[in-house]
Curated annotation (Swiss-Prot):
Its EC number(s): 3.1.26.4
KW Cytoplasm (keyword) present: yes
Function: Endonuclease that specifically degrades the RNA of RNA-DNA hybrids.
Pfam assignment, any one: RNase_HII
Cofactor binding annotation: Manganese or magnesium. Binds 1 divalent metal ion per monomer in the absence of substrate. May bind a second metal ion after substrate binding.
Cofactor(s) annotated in UniProt: Mn(2+); Mg(2+)
Family: Belongs to the RNase HII family. RnhC subfamily.
Gene that this sequence comes from: rnhC
Protein name as annotated: Ribonuclease HIII
Top-level taxon in the UniProt lineage: Bacteria
Length: 296
């Protein structure tokens, strides 16, 4: 829910009152003399001359009464050829870990906006499944999927990776492969999951290196179309893997790591034993222990 506050003259407030008279509501606020509710947006006019608009999209109504949204500033590099990389599945008990790196140029922006490309966290799975194939066909990218079986072979105590270093390895490899395919970016951005210092610490252990500098930026999938594209393709790859695993075991495997995952994991243990979790889940998650506790 958003809130917009406008300082208005008495004349402007009078116009607002007339326009919204049919939407007027009662108010018990001693400092307010008018209130209304229009299509989910609440409006309150105060004796101080301030008027608040509050709702899911308050800017729509507020714009009728003088509100002008500040133009969004394009992040540095948005108008450059950009490689963006993102991962999906690291927070889900079931399913693999998908990492995708994509190259987006300014010439791609109109196409991407026509599809409604945005941070995949704001898109439902149905929409992601719909537009991901179009992105895969149009946008140069490299996609990697670490299956649960392989994940459990390399991640854990005494193994080659921990839960963070394995993501560094996958991001590095996806970007490396994209560069090797001929991609020529002006900038490379990864949706930040680690500090740059620690990223470089793990990066030094990688076999495949490249000289191009990397920028780690928080919430990059909402700022850069290249990262948004990678996020969407990675989410689709993760979902397809989850579907495949679900078919193999005969249970619908949920995304996430909540109580539902504990319940399904316990059913898998009862039906198939420990090996079922080794091949469908990230075994080191706390869900494994919780699933065993459910069987006691």
């Amino acid at each position: 829910m958003g809130t917009i506050v406008l300082k208005m003259t008495a004349e402007q407030i009078s116009v607002l009152q007339k326009d919204l008279a049919s939407y007027a509501t009662a108010t018990k606020n001693p400092y307010a003399f008018f209130s209304a509710k229009v299509d989910g947006t609440s409006v309150i006019a105060y004796t101080s001359g301030k008027v608040t608009f509050q709702g899911a999209k308050p800017e729509i109504l507020a714009s009728r009464f003088g509100y002008q949204a500040e133009p969004k500033q394009s992040p540095d590099g948005q108008n450059l050829a950009l490689i963006g990389s993102d991962e999906v599945g690291n927070g889900s008990y079931f399913g693999g870990l998908a990492v995708v790196a994509s190259l987006v140029t300014p010439a791609d922006h109109a196409f991407l906006k026509s599809l409604g490309v945005d941070d995949s966290k704001n898109l439902n799975d149905s929409k992601i499944r719909q537009i991901a194939p179009l992105l895969e066909e149009k946008i140069p990218h490299k996609a990697l999927l670490l299956s649960p079986r392989k994940y459990n072979e390399v991640v854990g105590d005494g193994k080659a990776h921990n839960a963070v270093s394995v993501k560094v390895a996958l991001h590095n490899q996806a970007i490396f492969l994209l560069l090797q395919s001929g991609a020529k970016p002006d900038k490379i951005v990864i949706d930040a999951f680690i500090s740059e210092k620690n990223y470089q610490k793990y990066f030094k252990n990688e076999r495949n290196h490249f000289e191009f500098p990397i920028t780690l930026e928080e919430k990059a999938e909402g700022k850069y179309l290249a990262v948004a594209v990678s996020s969407i393709i990675a989410r689709n790859l993760f979902l397809k893997n989850l579907d495949k695993l679900s078919q193999e075991v005969g249970y619908t495997l949920p995304s996430g790591a909540g109580a539902k995952s504990d319940q399904v994991a316990a059913k898998l243990l009862q039906a198939y034993g420990d090996q079922a979790l080794q091949t469908t889940a990230k075994y080191h998650f706390a869900n494994t222990k919780k699933a065993y506790q459910r069987l006691k």
